[in-house]
Amino acid sequence: NNNGKKQESIKLIYKGGDILYISIHSLHKISKFSGKEGHQPSINQLGGTRWQTTKNKTKSRIKQIAYNLIQLYAKRKTIKGFSYSTDTYLQHELEASFMWEDTPDQILSTIAIKEDMEKETPMDRLICGDVGFGKTELAIRAAFKAVADNKQVAILVPTTILALQHYKTFRNRLKNFPCKVDYINRFKTTKQQNQTLKDLNEGKIDILIGTHRIIGKDVNFKDLGLLIIDEEQKFGVNIKDKLKNYKKNVDILTLSATPIPRTLQFSLLGARDLSIINTPPPNRIAIHTEIIGFNEETIRDAIQYEISRNGQIFFIHNRIENIKEIAGILQRLVPNAKIKVGHGQM
């Protein structure tokens, strides 16, 4: 109740029972707590200094992470890595056994990866291409090239399902070659995991596939030479660079259909090398992309076209604070569309 007038507001309760009412017109100033799952946040006192102290510590930590990243990338540019041999006859056999014809971009990317691996400077290359355009085949070829020089390969993926999918794909492609592929995840028994780790440490496993479990303290490679990161946009900075720090002269191959801005910026600035796979495989239509200003008529026409062919639309907006406003605009433009909102703080 504000001067006798009822007004909708959000009630915030602080430590000690202090209460603060936030007008619905100021909802953009607050957001839902986002932290570790199951973690109970500590409540601060209204007017206290603890929250400001926490923010200052967080800013300081972010600056330190950024500094460490700059140091890491600078060091990788000057450090001496492992120079791989030129292709063996087995490498040629593997590539010849690929059941599809390489696209022009696959050919160029394969050449670029091999040239990187044969240099003394550690490779750090981003392969950017849509789903189904052949990024995994490039990873298989790079992995086998490393194995051919008695190096081990770590493949970091974001989900257990993808780890199993890659395990089956790699095992099937390399079944006729001297290469041991294995995986590690939470569905393996403790005994099975321990055996996998033992074999890895003894060099009996050439390629290990897994989620962030493979960067655990108990995971020790005998001679890690190549790290492949798939769908890197789903990993945090610390997870990816923790494994890079494990061995600074390891070659890095990153695969992504939608690289995060930081990764793309590093590639555009030259801190990382970039290969783009634009050419679709035979019988696959290339994705059509247009960059235009926000235009309601264009948006309406595009959505209506998809609905008319029983398709679905994924509309991405970059701010949670007014994402519902955008949903309202879309609903106004296309009243017959069923629209739902989802974001990371739900």
Predicted region positions:
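Inter-lobe coupling/hinge segments of SF2-like helicase ATPases
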Residues: K80-F82, I111, K119-M346
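Upstream accessory/linker segments immediately N-terminal to the RecA-like ATPase cores of bacterial MutS
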Residues: N1-D105
